[in-house]
Design a protein with these regions (language model features):
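Ferredoxin-reductase
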Residues: 2-84
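FNR/FR-type flavoprotein reductase catalytic core
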Residues: 74-215
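Short, basic/aromatic-enriched C-terminal tail that caps enzymatic domains
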Residues: 1-4, 240-257
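Structural signal for conserved beta-strand scaffold positions within catalytic alpha/beta enzyme cores
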Residues: 12, 57, 158-160, 212, ...
């Protein structure tokens, strides 16, 4: 695993919603080496532990990386004080990402739940109109990146728990409907564990390969502290792996959710 530890200039910052921000960094070496589904560890000034944030998108040609995160505590609140022109101290890219085939046969479905929506964007950019993006949120004011997915050419289905926009309810029925259409090569998902369970179950029932990116508390981010353990069934045996180093992406056939 090749990663870099450095401070990179912030060239853009946007507020996507209440407490949700996107940052674009100029970091050519990270952009060149990053894979879809990997993450970074960001240093929050005054705090010992870094905060893990998924990579939303990279532009290898321009040497940039976009990160999207939600303020969920004092650490991410401190990071959100950084502005355009400041330096962001990151370790990146980390972990193992999605195994997205270069040969793009068939369709793919990406399923994002809330702040699990960002790490799937580059899959939509790769597949364009052969990607269906099912994005679930609590309400209209929590919806993010739906326009970015549309600009990538994806067929976008937004779901909200309260019905304030898009499909009223969870991602379950839209996912079942899309799988029933057939010609689906894979399903990729990131979001809350109950959603991931539903995605894996639906994909298995349809006989479609799936991968999920786990949301997990982390310490070191490089596999040393074993804070972020998860269980998989591999070769008929139960094994404990580290989300940060062995993941955060795992096959739906293996991971125990």
């Amino acid at each position: 695993m090749s990663f870099f530890c450095d401070s990179y200039p912030i060239i853009d910052k946007k507020a996507l919603g209440e407490g949700i921000y996107s940052y674009t960094l100029k970091c050519p070496e990270v952009a060149e080496n990053a894979h879809i589904g990997q993450f970074v560890q960001i240093k929050a000034e005054g705090y010992m532990l870094r905060r893990p944030i998924s990579i939303c998108s990279v532009d290898k040609e321009n040497g940039t990386m976009m990160l999207v995160f939600e303020v969920r505590g004092k650490g991410t609140d401190k990071i959100s004080e950084l502005n355009k022109g400041d330096l962001m101290d990151v370790i990146a890219p980390l972990g193992n990402g999605f195994t997205v085939p270069a040969k793009k046969d068939g369709r793919v479905i990406v399923v994002g739940g809330g702040i699990g929506t960002p790490p799937l964007l580059d899959i939509a950019k790769m597949y364009g109109d052969r990607c269906t993006a099912i994005l679930g949120f609590r309400s209209f004011d929590k919806v993010i990146l739906d326009k970015d997915y549309s600009l990538a050419g994806a067929n976008v289905i937004v779901c909200t728990d309260d019905g304030s926009t898009g499909v009223h309810g969870t991602i379950a029925q839209p996912l079942a409907d899309e799988l029933a259409k057939g010609d689906v090569a894979a399903v990729y998902a990131c979001g809350p564990t109950p959603m991931l369970k539903a995605v894996v179950a639906a994909a298995k029932q349809a006989g479609v390969y799936s991968e999920v990116s786990l949301e997990q508390r982390m310490g070191c981010g490089v596999g040393a502290c074993v804070v972020c353990a998860c269980t998989v069934i591999r070769d008929g045996e139960e094994k404990v792996l580290r989300v940060c180093k062995d993941g955060p992406v795992f096959s739906g056939e293996e991971v125990v959710l």
